[in-house]
From Swiss-Prot:
Binding site for FMN: I49, K50, N115, E124, R140, Y141, S190
Family designation: Belongs to the NtaA/SnaA/DszA monooxygenase family. RutA subfamily.
Catalytic activity: uracil + FMNH2 + NADH + O2 = (Z)-3-ureidoacrylate + FMN + NAD(+) + H2O + H(+); thymine + FMNH2 + NADH + O2 = (Z)-2-methylureidoacrylate + FMN + NAD(+) + H2O + H(+)
High-level lineage: Bacteria, Pseudomonadati, Pseudomonadota, Alphaproteobacteria, Hyphomicrobiales
Name the UniProt record assigns to this protein: Pyrimidine monooxygenase RutA
GO biological process, one term: alkanesulfonate catabolic process
């Protein structure tokens, strides 16, 4: 089973709270996190792309780095870990992203892939004059499909005359070709998103849910497996969890309660407003799921809270769900969280026994 880290490219990570660790994103912070993840044998790191924050007292995600340039820098200071950058498809032409990816493939020696972000937060794009209108909600995966087709043709042949509804190439050239396969990942939660991932992605990120309910993603995995059965491709689920660990269950739960008590309500209001813009969104879509009231302070992602032994046991249960190829983790405190996980949690995980690397 693969293990990845969802790095904090935006301030305060994934906790919309004034009581959680407060920090700004920097290259040095993310370098430290990714290098330590590599040290502990993590297989991959992913950076999101977010172009407008949620505001509130915590100024949540008002500070964000850019994904490709960050990962290019990290590629130069790592040696084994796979790196995924995110492209917001409304912001960068596919031919440019194909060339950027080829460059980072060269820097990393074949450790680079791309996460396709079709976009659900209208304000991110509207502020730059890039929002094509609300009908985009209905065709964003068709748009993303053509986007990926253009990139893959350029990577495969170095040229494209692609003629689609949204993109038209005219004797478009891109050389050198990438020396290695550039993997594609997606994060489809809706049936349309799952179908896109099953057709074009190598992995699909799946949102786990609940607190200490490690197998709650079983239905989403089943939906992905059904979608993959129709395409005949091998696409596994990378399941997203937040880890809040401490020496005892009680200490970890006390931290989680404190974060909940400090929920930044104003930031949640902004997120809910953005999530409501797509009137046709499926109930399982990302925009709907992250705004469910039960646990919106961390986007309703699956949350594992407990002692090191409890966290290890629950993550092993998560890994056992059919279709799960890996887990992607966030932490309440990334610097301390990576160290605690590497030293105290991972050695207890049976699902990681075959992957453990000796400390350098």
């Amino acid at each position: 089973m693969d293990l990845g880290v969802f790095i904090p490219i935006g301030n305060n990570g994934w906790l919309i709270s004034t009581a959680s660790p407060q920090y700004k994103p920097t290259f040095e912070l993310n370098k430290q996190i990714v290098q330590r993840a590599e040290h502990y044998g993590f297989e991959f790191a992913l950076s999101m792309i977010k172009l407008r924050g949620f505001g509130g007292k915590s100024e949540f995600w008002d500070y964000n780095l850019e994904s490709f340039t960050l990962m290019a820098g990290l590629a130069a200071v790592t040696s084994r870990i796979k790196l995924f950058a995110s492209t917001a498809v409304l912001t960068l032409p596919p031919a440019i992203v194909a060339r950027m990816a080829t460059t980072i493939d060269s820097i990393s020696g074949g450790r680079f892939g791309i996460n396709i972000v079709s976009g659900w937060a209208k304000a991110e794009y509207e502020q730059m004059g890039l929002w094509p209108g609300d009908d985009y909600f209905g065709y964003r995966y068709a748009y993303s499909t053509e986007y990926v087709q253009v990139m893959q043709e350029l990577w495969r042949t170095g040229a494209s005359d692609f003629k689609g509804k949204y993109f038209q190439m005219t004797d478009c050239h891109m050389k050198p070709l990438p020396a290695h396969k550039i993997e594609i990942v997606a994060a489809g939660q809706s049936p349309t998103g799952m179908a896109f991932a099953a057709t074009y992605a190598d992995y699909n990120f799946v949102l786990a849910s609940g607190v200490n309910t490690p197998t709650a993603h079983v239905k989403l995995n089943e939906q992905l497996l059904d979608a993959v059965a129709k395409t005949g491709r091998d696409v596994g689920a990378y399941v997203l969890f937040m880890v809040i660990a401490d020496e005892t269950d009680e200490a970890a739960m006390a931290k989680w309660q404190a974060y909940k008590d400090g929920t930044d309500v104003d930031a949640l209001v902004w997120m809910a407003d953005q999530g409501s813009k797509d009137q046709s969104a499926a109930g399982s879509s990302t925009a709907k799921t992250i705004n469910l009231p039960e646990q919106a302070l961390n986007f309703n992602m699956g949350t594992i809270v407990g002692s090191y032994a409890t966290v290890a046991r629950l993550l092993d249960e998560a890994a056992s769900v059919p279709g799960t190829k890996g887990l992607m983790l966030t932490f309440d405190d990334f610097v301390q969280g990576i160290e605690s996980f590497g030293q105290h949690v991972q050695p207890l995980m049976t699902s990681r026994a075959a992957r453990l690397l000796p400390a350098a």
